[in-house]
Amino acid sequence: QLLEAVGWSRRPVRRVRKALDNSLLRVGLWRHDPRIPRLVGFARCTGDGVLEATVWDVAVHPLYQGAGLGRQLMDYILDALKEMGTERATLFADPGVLPFYERLGWDLEPNGHRCGFWYSN
């Protein structure tokens, strides 16, 4: 439901499962309703977790956007990467969400490649 809501439903489920299995880190935010559990936010990372990691597939269901959930996902991911000792993280994003990552302190690639960089202190 989340992938459909954010327009990513074109990915075959089998391939998505394989990507998740091979990810370094997976984070999900669930709506707590025992009648209808719903994944409302998600993000994942790939990489070695020491020198580099790449953040992928950050998504928040449109009904829950604007409530700080995207920031919570990114804060959790960066805290986990710091804990692992990761030196650098990169991400790739659609142009419409680049201001979100700028507000979180990511350095955006100046040549318009839709990617950003984060460096550990």
Regions found by a protein language model. Give the residues of each.
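Short amphipathic alpha-helix that is part of the acyltransferase structural core
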Residues: 1-14, 32-36, 112
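A conserved beta-strand-loop-helix scaffold within acyl/acetyltransferase catalytic domains
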Residues: 14-59
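Conserved acetyl-CoA pyrophosphate-binding loop and the N-cap/start of the following alpha-helix
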Residues: 64, 68-76
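Conserved short alpha-helix immediately C-terminal to the canonical SAM/SAH-binding motif I
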Residues: 73, 97-100
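Conserved GNAT acetyl-CoA-binding A-motif
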Residues: 74, 79-94
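Conserved catalytic-core motifs of GNAT/GCN5-like acyltransferases
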Residues: 90-92, 102, 107-121
